[in-house]
């Protein structure tokens, strides 16, 4: 029996930060729904953008691409961005693809020009 892959997210906003909680499996079939919510908040430079991955079980290259896009936009704006509760399997993928090199150990975005200047190094 094949399990149905399910991805869910919910967003909390308080005027100072937008926190998006991700759970389940983020793959090509689920990416457009996350892309829509990210598009609605990623350019709000006065508010911290936080992705909470605590309940994320799986992420494919499409999902990683969405996160990389958010990193690039936030870095170009010098806006606050953070990824909280990165599961070990996802952390390993971030390490392999180079995404981790743009985050501090606590998941916050490094102040680093290489993010926007050397896009080919991410993924």
List the predicted regions and their residue ranges.
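STAS-like cytosolic regulatory interaction modules
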Residues: 1-57, 69-123
């Amino acid at each position: 029996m094949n399990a149905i892959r399910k991805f869910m997210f919910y967003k909390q906003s308080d005027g100072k930060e937008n926190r998006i909680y991700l759970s389940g499996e983020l793959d090509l079939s689920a990416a457009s729904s996350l892309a829509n919510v990210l598009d609605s908040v990623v350019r709000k430079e006065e508010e911290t953008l936080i992705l909470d991955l605590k309940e994320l079980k799986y992420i494919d290259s499409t999902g990683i691409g969405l996160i990389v896009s958010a990193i690039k936009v936030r870095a170009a704006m010098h806006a606050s961005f953070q990824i909280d509760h990165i599961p070990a399997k996802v952390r390993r993928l971030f390490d392999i693809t180079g995404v981790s090199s743009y985050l501090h150990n606590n998941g916050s975005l490094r102040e680093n020009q290489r993010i926007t200047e050397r896009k080919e190094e991410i993924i």
